[in-house]
Amino acid sequence: MNITQAYKRSLWWSMDMVGATGSVERKMLTAVGLQFLAAGGMAFLTVFTAGTVQLIGVGGMLALSVVAFYNTYLIAEADFVEPLVALEDAADDIAAGEFERADIPSSKRDDEIASLVASFDGMQSNLEVASRQADALARQAFDDPALDESVPGAFGESITEMADSLEAYTAELEDKTAELEHQQAELERQSEQLRALVDALSEATDAARAGDLTATVDAAALDVTDDHRAAVEDFNQLLETLADTISDIQSFSDAVLAVSRTTDERVDAVADRSAAVSESVTEIADGANQQTNQLNNIAAEMDTVSATVEEIAASANDVAKTAQAAADRGEDGRGEVEETIEALRALREQSQAVAETVESLAAEVERIDGITALIEDIAEETNMLALNASIEAARTGSDGDGFAVVADEVKDLAEETREQAADISEIVDAVTEKAEDASIAIGEVDAEVERKITKAEGVLRDFEAIVDEVANVNHAVQEISDATDQGAQSVTDVVGMVEEVASVSEETAAESDTVADNAAEQTDATDEVADQMDELAEQTAALAGMLDDFTVPADAGTADQSVADDSPTAQPPAADDEPAAAVVDQPQPASDAEDEEGVPDSGGESVAVSDGGWADDRSSFTWADSQ
């Protein structure tokens, strides 16, 4: 044990003796009290002692101050710095998630710092337990002993609830897993059933493709569901329907063969009759064409006459339009002349009004001139009075100075008034001269306006005469235009009638040609129909040979056949279980090509069946389910 540790022990023993270790506050007060006591002692010695005693006392107080400072340092380091630094390190470890590495220092004291350390240690323990529980939940180790440990507060309750929820969820997942395994086994069983069903359907389909329509699928021998059993029954029903249809087609092909032979004979008779009709219609068409040519010539001549009349009518219309335009222009010119006369008359009235205004102005100027003369007379008399007043003022001497001044002012005013009156007189003379000039000019304007009015009235009379003459010309031209229009309309009506007759003749010729062509085409068509009926007979025989390759049940196609003798289309009655209707399209022109089996090309002939249709195209059968 060194001196420092011994001193620390003695220091804390002494603080225990005085009861200062139980509180940080008392520790600090004790250290500060010692320093204050040393400072107070030094002050006391400085005031009340002197000499050697003072020096010894001050030295002792200084040593006491050093001891008090050192004690304060030891207390702060041991009770404050070291515990707080340790708590900081532990908090850093906890913040980093290292709960087990957090080392909380123990404290043997019972002050506030010791209480803080104890609380922090409890928090670290709870966090460590929570960490172990979270790890156990993550590993789904619900029997881990850590889950039995309790964590106080709401956080511990949350951990417990989370553990219970996870355990329940895990149990539910186990149940779902077992259910999925059961469903997987069921799916595997159904897959085996479907595989067996597909194999059976494949064998039956191969047999049907080979022509054996008696090969069906035994649904009772297969372990399948009701839906799959219904599909098997539909497939078997489909084969039965196909067998019935093929049997009906076999019967139908025999009927078609008989009908084709009868039709061939009738077609030959129709061909002979069509040839005779074609010759007669050709003769009618030739006569209609000749008549049409003659009518077309007449119509051409009438078109020429109509064009000439229309040109005359157009020329007359142009002349009428020109005359009407001239009349309109004459009317417009007369209106403009009348407007000009009215404007000149208004100008004359305005100039007369201006002349009257100028004369009134001259009269007023003369009045101003009289007033100006009166002002000059008054100014002259005022000047004379001022002169007399000056003479009287001079005669009275010094007593008349004031009167003399007034006389001078009056004299000056009279002089100024006379000068202004002279200026006004000059202005009045100038205004009078201008007014006289304006009056002369206005008189000249009135004379000129009067001449213009007289001339415009003469022009107006000329315009009225022109308008009357143009109106007469326009009326005459209009009568000519109306007459030519009527003539043109008459010619047009005649041309229309001729053209209508020619059109009827052309239509008759065209229809005759059409009838002749149709008769020829009918003859060709009957020949072609005869050829096609022969080909149909050959194809029907080939179809019967191909149908013989199919194996059908003995009771298939038991329905009777009904064939019309005069129609190439036959509809055999349907079977009892599935209604079926066969329609044979009109045969197309046959080709000379044959397929590999030596069967003539059908040329596009097809036989359609409404339920489960099949088609014969170039001697090959293709199954097409018509749904």
Curated annotation (Swiss-Prot):
UniProt keywords, alphabetically: Cell membrane, Chemotaxis, Membrane, Methylation, Repeat, Transducer, Transmembrane, Transmembrane helix
Record-level GO cellular component terms: plasma membrane
SMART domains according to UniProt: HAMP, MA
Ranges for domain HAMP: 78-132, 192-247
Region Disordered: start-end pairs: 505-527, 557-627
InterPro entries, alphabetized: Chemotax_Me-accpt_rcpt, HAMP_dom, MCPsignal_dom
Entry keyword annotation includes Cell membrane: yes
Biased composition (Low complexity): 580-590
Cellular localisation: Cell membrane
Post-translational modification remark: Methylated by CheR.
Task performed by this protein: Mediates bacteriorhodopsin- and halorhodopsin-dependent photoresponses by detecting membrane potential changes. Probably transduces the signal to the histidine kinase CheA.
Protein family membership: Belongs to the methyl-accepting chemotaxis (MCP) protein family.
Effect of a null allele: Deletion abolishes bacteriorhodopsin- and halorhodopsin-dependent phototaxis.
Transmembrane segments: 28-48, 55-75
Pfam families on file: HAMP, MCPsignal
Subunit structure: Interacts with CheA, CheY and CheW1.
Entry protein name: Transducer protein MpcT
GO process annotations (BP): chemotaxis; signal transduction
Residues that bear Glutamate methyl ester (Glu): E310, E416, E507
Principal location listed in the UniProt entry: membrane
GO molecular function, one term: transmembrane signaling receptor activity
SUPFAM superfamilies: HAMP domain-like, Methyl-accepting chemotaxis protein (MCP) signaling domain
Membrane topology, from the record: Multi-pass membrane protein
Domain Methyl-accepting transducer: 266-502
